[in-house]
């Protein structure tokens, strides 16, 4: 992977939008009140686009979606000390943070929202609930250390996110 800064875990992020150009976010089970877009590590030998679609399916159950755009460069964020210690134990590395390749992905149609399943038949779901949010809400509700990255993602995809509709109510992972 070209232009990847050393010391940063290769990762992808997915800005999933619906037909109203609202953005999918989910609240983390381990960080109450923190909402985020789907993201995850790139596996050995995997290209970033494939990783993005795999992560989308793993975290949301969505398979009927298409990549619309991408952020041309890698975006990075540093882990706060407590998060860094935890993830380095978990991942078995010495990572300063994550380098992310971001993709804008659109549901193929509104019926595809029915696919969203945070548990996705896995016992270890990362999320408690999900919702469709306006772009500015995505940034406001992110954890502090991810906000600059989210701001850049929303800015880059801004032309696709204009004229957004109303945010939908939260959806429980257990529905």
From Swiss-Prot:
Share the entry's pH-dependence remark.
Optimum pH is 8.0. Active from pH 6.8 to 9.5.
Report the SUPFAM superfamilies cross-referenced here.
Answer: Nudix
| Catalyzed reaction equations | P(1),P(4)-bis(5'-guanosyl) tetraphosphate + H2O = GMP + GTP + 2 H(+)
The answer, when asked if Metal-binding is one of the entry's keywords, is yes
Nudix hydrolase domain location is 7-155
PROSITE patterns tied to this protein? NUDIX, NUDIX_BOX
**Free-text disruption phenotype from the record:** No visible phenotype under normal growth conditions.
Which cofactors is this protein said to need? Mn(2+)
Q: Which family does it belong to?
A: Belongs to the Nudix hydrolase family.
- The protein depicted here goes by the name Nudix hydrolase 25
Organism of derivation: Arabidopsis thaliana (Mouse-ear cress)
Q: What is the lineage of its organism?
A: Eukaryota, Viridiplantae, Streptophyta, Embryophyta, Tracheophyta
